[in-house]
Amino acid sequence: MDEKGTSGELVTEGFEYDGGRQVTVYLPPVRSQAVVFAGDGQLISHWGADLEAADLPPTMIVGVHRSADETLRLHEYSPGFDPQRFAAHEEFFANDVRRWAQSRFGVVMPPERTAVCGVSASGELALAVGLRHPCVYGAVLCASPGGGYRPPDVMPSSLPRAYLVAGTQERFFLGNAKRWAVALRDAGGEVVMTARVGSHGDAFWREEFPLMVAWAFGGKAGRAPSERITGPERGCP
């Protein structure tokens, strides 16, 4: 299904960050009951129709567009390459955009109704931002994460829930996802790790997106996760 099949609305606004960066928001046809903040937002924000087609709570998608420069994209999304660049983008993503969305659309969600999502390199962003802001993002939805950001030796005491997925035909990214699943589990986090037949690309991620949202916020979206890894619950301080 493409965006023409949605009865929701797409709103795009420009920001001054980095000389001009766009954010696209998918607004469901009825009042939102949950919100997903996403990196690579020029892509993920257009998947609202897939959520409408599934039996899911109405979910807003706030998609922050990527940099057109692939190197800068990696530096914004993965904290190890250029910490200053990452921190500037983190401030924009986690604070400026979130506050704008709350003011612009009047939707303020508790952590259990708020997720951060990413695919490939922006999957690293979702993990990094989720670990840094567990009292904002109650769930991390991460597909096919890159290998630039690896689990820290010492995990935060408060962890968001995490759903990780990768395709069986993208072994490098599958290995990255499994590494994170084990590390989060060992730190006491609640984790779902899913491996499905598929390769690295938009079609695979788009098919998985409603399943991620169903896991995070409830509802039915088809297949159940293949593996559930859990640890003791951790609360925010």
Tell where the protein language model's regions lie, with residue ranges.
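Non-catalytic cap/lid and distal C-terminal segments of serine-dependent acyl enzymes
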Residues: M1-P237
